[in-house]
Swiss-Prot record:
CDD domains: ABCD_peroxisomal_ALDP (cd03223). Pfam families: ABC_membrane_2 (PF06472), ABC_tran (PF00005). It is an enzyme of class 7 (translocase). Residues 545-569 are annotated as: Disordered. It is found in: Membrane; Plastid, Chloroplast. This is ABC transporter D family member 2, chloroplastic. It is a multi-pass membrane protein. It comes from Arabidopsis thaliana. Residues 88-372 form the ABC transmembrane type-1 domain. The modification N-acetylserine is found at S45. Residues 430-697 form the ABC transporter domain. Its main location: membrane. The gene is ABCC2. Residues 560-569 have a biased composition (Basic and acidic residues). ATP binds at G464, P465, S466, G467, S468, G469, K470, T471.
């Protein structure tokens, strides 16, 4: 509701003041207003949002402040601190200037209305000219203050987004958060919460500073005019705040529930979109319709309760807003009638009264925004603590943990007398020692005391019934699961530099270069066909990196390949596509640099062949294949295995088809573990040479690309 106020009650200088305040309110409550249709913007002192702060927040202010400081402080001590502090100082300087301009307008208004009441046309013309000049000179300060604040907020958000993303993607933290359900919606925290935090923190800080200076300046003016009016203001503002909080406390849970229920409804719609084909095959449209309507009805019913509660609160707030327009006039009117003050002083007292009331009622006016901001601080504080500690305990509280290491073979048999590295014809690639693997959720044992070695040119097939732990074993090899005990050791290329110790990050980089995992459903990145092929080994945007391999700003590139491995050329990529029978898709989709939703436009079989193309380009020492040919026919499956075997890649496969045995020389057979027994539930056996790929290399059959 926008109140239209006559000039004696809300003069132009006061409207300028209130338009500035409303911009602050817009910044502070921006994200909440998008979600809550009951949040309205009104002019002057007519905004009284519904409270939505949890009742127990008062007792947690100290904790909230600590979280706020922990989240906010890194930027102000970062490499961008000089620019940040300079811009912040400029914002505060402009805030002081705008407060001074508002005080000047207050006195201009007094003289302006005095000349009008005295019917002094010459003085009125002069004061009108002063007013127009003051507007022309004052408005740029208000605009520049808001612009400087918004650019600082954008700069802060950019830095924080990169800061949190680096920590989120480090050491597989993102996977641990998702797989163990430690916190909800990390993506929302990285996007919505970070955006809201930076904008609201600056806006609220600016509003507090502005309100403090404003309160001091106009309290002196109001107290000079009529001290009892200052007392009336205190009683009115504190009383209104208390009543509003009391009447609006029922809105707290309703607002939070509304956000959750609407999010649930949106998520249901996203699931329909992502699983459209499966739903269509099942003919499950009616079931989906019922589920969607059920969630919509839940949100609708809660919103109805929210509207009723808001209506009840507005019975008070509307009266509060209207009464404020005549209350100061009613208090000082007897002084005007007795001749103790001029008419312009009435306008001055109304202006000062509205300024001070706005400052005293700041908590009331920003109640809903403050509650939303406190929720943002809670969520980001929780997220920040999680990323800082980087400690993920298994819910089963397993004491033992699988030891996963990456090292190089370094012994006397590997070195000549002059210290150079000997050529090793059968290098060990993987060693598993006494591995007992358990699920991270409830500690159920999947594999008992597994020991196995995989050497160069070995091809191991892991088989077993569904749920026996085949894929879980690969998760343990990838470092995704640590529940259990035992040791897994990957042996890197012996050509690495032994003279330098490797950090954890360097070891992980080495692991990424030497071991590549192919899941059953390959991950299709957002980008071009070229990026699909280069992922995850090389960056697709070389021009954005320095010769040393880092980004221009000094950070590591998103996709890393060890030095000495040249990035494939366009011809290399096309030849590799031909090797996996996908030479036609570049023409089909407009070239290597065309961008599509690849997980939708390519069939699962084509995606699996594309994953094998990545494997051939990366040339890892060891490949872990989790049913990576499940969507392919036997001819294509055989052809792809022949390609990677010819490339000299050692691989470990998981599969159910007996036809896979001919592509391997060893089989690890896993049976379902007996929870009451500690006996091993696995065996390793050799595959008959004549059934293996070694005996079939001369019988190659090239399948069709269709």
């Amino acid at each position: 509701m926008i109140l239209m106020i006559t000039a004696p009650v809300c003069p132009p200088h006061l409207l300028l003041r209130h338009s500035s305040l409303l911009r602050h309110e817009s910044s502070i409550g921006n994200f909440h207003r998008k979600k809550n249709p009951r949040f309205r913007t009104v002019s002057c002192s007519s905004l009284l949002p519904q409270p939505s702060v949890r009742p127990d927040k008062a007792s947690e202010l100290k904790t909230l402040w600590k979280k706020f400081y922990k989240v906010a402080s890194p930027y102000w001590f970062s490499e961008d601190k000089d620019q940040a502090r300079l811009r912040l100082a400029a914002v505060f300087a402009l805030t002081l200037a705008t407060t001074g301009i508002s005080v000047g307008f207050n006195f201009l208004g007094r003289d302006f209305y005095n000349s009008l009441a005295n019917k002094d046309q010459e003085q009125f013309t002069k004061q009108l000219f002063y007013y127009l000049c003051a507007f022309a000179g004052g408005i740029p300060f208000f605009v520049l203050r808001d612009y400087t604040k918004e650019t600082l907020s954008l700069r802060w958000r950019s830095w924080m987004t990169k800061y949190y993303l680096q920590r989120y993607l480090k050491d597989q933290t993102f996977y641990k958060i998702q797989s163990q359900s430690i916190i909800d919606n990390p993506d929302q925290r990285l996007v919505d919460d970070l955006s809201s935090f930076t904008g609201t923190a600056l806006s609220f800080s600016l509003t507090l500073v502005n309100a403090t200076i404003d309160l001091i300046s106009f309290s002196n003016i109001l107290f000079t005019i009529y001290p009892p009016l200052f007392l009336v203001l205190l009683l009115y503002s504190f009383g209104g705040t208390a009543i509003s909080v009391f009447l609006g406390k029922g809105l707290v849970n309703l607002n939070f529930l509304q956000e959750k229920k609407e999010a649930d409804f949106r998520y249901s719609l996203v699931r329909v979109r992502e699983n459209a084909e499966s739903i269509a095959f099942y003919g499950g449209e009616q079931n989906e319709m019922q589920l969607l309507l059920q969630r919509f009805r839940s949100a609708f019913d809660n919103l109805t309760e929210l509207l009723i509660a808001s209506r009840n609160l507005e019975f008070f707030t509307d009266g509060y807003r209207y009464l404020i327009q005549i209350l100061p006039v009613a208090v000082v009117a007897p002084m005007y009638f007795s001749g103790k003050i001029e008419f312009g002083v009435i306008n001055q007292s109304v202006s000062a009264f509205n300024h001070i009331l706005g400052d005293f009622s700041l908590v009331v006016y920003q109640f809903q925004a403050i509650s939303s901001f406190s929720a943002v601080i809670d969520r980001l504080g929780e997220f920040d603590d999680l990323l800082d500690n980087n400690i993920f305990r298994d819910p089963s509280d397993t004491v033992d943990e699988i030891e996963l290491t990456y090292q190089s073979e370094m012994n006397s048999s590997l070195l000549d007398t002059n210290g150079s590295i000997k050529s090793q014809p059968n290098q060990k690639r993987l060693e598993i020692e006494e591995l007992t693997l358990q699920t991270p959720t409830n500690g159920t044992t999947l594999v008992h005391n597994l020991s196995a070695d995989v050497y160069d040119k070995d091809h191991l097939l892991i088989m077993g019934p569904s749920g026996s732990g085949k894929t879980s074993l690969l998760r343990a090899m990838a470092g995704l699961w640590r529940s259990g005990k035992g040791k897994i050791t990957f042996y890197l290329d012996p050509e690495v530099d032994f003279t330098q110790e490797k950090s954890d990050t360097q070891e992980n980089s080495g692991k990424r270069g030497d071991v590549l995992f192919l899941p059953q459903r390959p991950y299709m990145v957002l980008g071009s066909l070229r990026q699909q092929l280069l992922y995850p080994t090389w960056s697709a945007t070389v021009e954005e990196t320095t010769p040393g391999g880092s980004n221009i700003d000094g950070s590591p590139p998103l996709l890393i390949r060890e030095d000495g491995n040249e990035k494939p050329t366009t011809d290399d990529l096309m030849r590799t596509l031909e090797k996996v029978c996908l030479g036609h898709i570049a023409d089909r989709f407009g070239g290597l640099d065309s961008i599509h939703e690849w997980s939708s436009v390519l069939s699962l079989g084509e995606q699996q062949r594309l994953a094998f193309a990545r494997l051939l380009l990366s040339q890892p020492k060891l490949a872990l294949l989790d049913e990576s040919t499940s969507a392919l026919d036997e001819a294509n499956e055989a052809f792809l295995y022949q390609q990677i075997q010819s490339a000299g890649i050692t691989y470990i496969s998981i599969g159910h088809r007996r036809t896979l045995t001919k592509f391997h020389n060893k089989i690890l057979q896993i049976s379902t573990a007996d929870p009451k027994s500690n006996e091993r539930n696995w065996r390793i056996e050799d595959v008959d040479a004549q059934d293996s790929l070694y005996g079939r290399l001369n019988q190659k059959e090239v399948p069709s690309e269709s």
